[in-house]
Amino acid sequence: MVDKTSVAAEIAEPERRKVFRKVFRQLGAATVITMFGKAVLDSRPARAASVLRPPGALPEPEFNAACIRCGLCVEACPLDILHLASWSDPAPTGTPYFVGRTDPCRMCPDIPCARACPTGALSPLLTDIKKADMGVAVLVGHETCLNYKGLTCSICVRVCPIIGEAISLKQIKNERGVLQIPTVDSSKCTGCGTCEKHCVLSEAAIRLLPRELGLGVEGAQSVGRW
């Protein structure tokens, strides 16, 4: 007499093996995708030098920890200056940023972006926009700035919203004679990006950088090297 249970088991066995193989393949693919995604995320720079945070932003590590990627600050910006970083942007995904060369911060007196932040990633303690610290302007193009070539350009000085304080022309002497060189007072500069936006060169001679880069703040690698 044929054991029907045994026959049924033999018939079902290949089907079970097929199901298991499919499950294992899917798990394997998911694992590879997860590992690849993590590797890509880990290899990306946390924030490119051209990417600036909204006014009131905490220092970068604290900001990334406090920001919940809600986008309320972006919605609150009346001039659509702020953007939420996507996968392809040079900043942690979902965090707000702006690029001074294309769209500088207009320094709204009531700082609506900071007021909209629910977590304090953009500090509510910032009440005077002139005290904002989004970055610092740095004259990086000593070879390209028109003033270093003996001409006189004052665009960056004239468009600065902290006029007469953050950027001024200072005289220096070299083989070309007396030059008028744009000079930034880092204690007054808010990092809005207006000077970089309006630089007449195709590659701006004055650039906005995160303050720790622009002022050369010492990092962990400097320990024991002096």
Curated annotation (Swiss-Prot):
Chain residues that bind [4Fe-4S] cluster 2: C105, C108, C113, C117
Binding site for [4Fe-4S] cluster 3: C145, C153, C156, C160
Record pathway: One-carbon metabolism; methylamine degradation
One protein family per Pfam: Fer4_7
Positions contributing to [4Fe-4S] cluster 1 binding: C67, C70, C73, C77
Disulfide bonds: none
Residues binding [4Fe-4S] cluster 4, per UniProt: C189, C192, C195, C199
CDD domains (UniProt xref): DMSOR_beta_like
Example GO molecular function: 4 iron, 4 sulfur cluster binding
Source domain of life: Bacteria
UniProt KW keywords: 4Fe-4S, Electron transport, Iron, Iron-sulfur, Metal-binding, Repeat, Transport
Functional summary from the UniProt entry: Involved in electron transfer.
Protein name: Methylamine utilization ferredoxin-type protein MauM
Organism per entry: Methylophilus methylotrophus (Bacterium W3A1)
Underlying gene: mauM
